[in-house]
């Protein structure tokens, strides 16, 4: 992918994996506090968590959650039935991606995760 704005620093990390803990709205709010504090990412608003609550296909039930960062934001999608998550950390600030992956794996008790910078 061609970098259309080389003068603007951007870092985008995608992490996906199957988790083994029970996830609810509070779990996601607590995760945002956990990961932002450990990566020194500053928020400027409260996390927003949406539950699909029976809309759409059964296999897609779960949560969509976002927290705004001073330097962009973090989004996570949760598929409750499959116990699968997809996390995107998008920042205009550098952060240690290996630590972000390790923190996510630890918090959600993920045995195998895949990740990619883009």
Q: Model-derived features: where do they sit?
A:
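Polybasic/polar functional segments that serve as interface/processing modules
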Residues: 1-118
């Amino acid at each position: 992918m061609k970098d259309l704005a080389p003068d603007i620093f951007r870092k985008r990390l995608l992490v996906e994996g199957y988790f083994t803990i029970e996830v609810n709205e509070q779990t996601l709010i607590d995760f945002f506090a956990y990961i932002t504090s450990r990566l020194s990412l500053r928020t400027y608003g409260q996390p927003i968590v949406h539950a699909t609550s029976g809309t759409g296909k059964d296999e897609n039930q779960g949560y969509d959650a976002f927290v705004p960062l001073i330097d962009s934001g973090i989004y996570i999608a949760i598929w409750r039935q499959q116990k699968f998550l997809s996390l995107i950390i998008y920042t205009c600030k550098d952060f240690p991606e290996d630590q972000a992956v390790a923190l996510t794996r630890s918090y959600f008790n993920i045995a195998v995760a895949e990740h990619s910078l883009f």
